[in-house]
């Protein structure tokens, strides 16, 4: 995922509009991506309540409601402002929903047995300054409902209301989201430690034709980005063709670390995994290991046959080591064999 500043995103959006893409089209494209992602995370239709501000972020939320409605969702909205203060785009998007969605005058109640989503469309990345009283009150309401009702999830559009998109600093009553649908790119503030409890899971919604200048040397690594490194295995492959990982991990009181890292090696696709442990802990750890893991007891790590292995994983849970063991580990590192070393 690209990571960008608020300024660069606003520049990219203006350039796209100037090049001939209407703002309404951008809104529909972004909202379609948000709705699609929502339905992937929540495949069973439920109730979605949009919290709508007077700007175009509210228009995004209303457009998402319209799409969800067409897929069997119940919809409604709460708003901080009278409609005569809404943006023209937001009013047009509301008018397109037929029949009109229910406007909640009081906090919505969760539906038993159905997913309930609170969709944060109160403010976008262009909002500046402290939250106004009416916005802050609805933010607090969303957080209260989410925290009191286990089946309720909050989804923020682009940025949780009350979180600075560039610094990640949250204001009082900032929306605590379970998902943030980042339009075009992830705003840099969402990666700051201060934003962790408010951003939730980040989802990037692509906008065709949007060319945003990303921050230099900054990219958010995702699972889809890593899949190219995991090639499909030929059906004729044998375990000896998929590499042999030598693991040095675990000690008395920290046996779980050995199991976790060995299972990780298997899940990564290693054909063979051999765990080396000292003889005094072998009886404790061997029975707990998955049957695919070979466990070898050693007097010292110097007993390990280095040439046997195509890669090493060293360190999880080994605790303090003797000078002899430390020297053996140094020898392994000096061979240049690919190694994951746990500090």
Regions found by a protein language model. Give the residues of each.
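Internal gly/pro-rich beta-alpha loop/helix module
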Residues: 116-117, 122-217
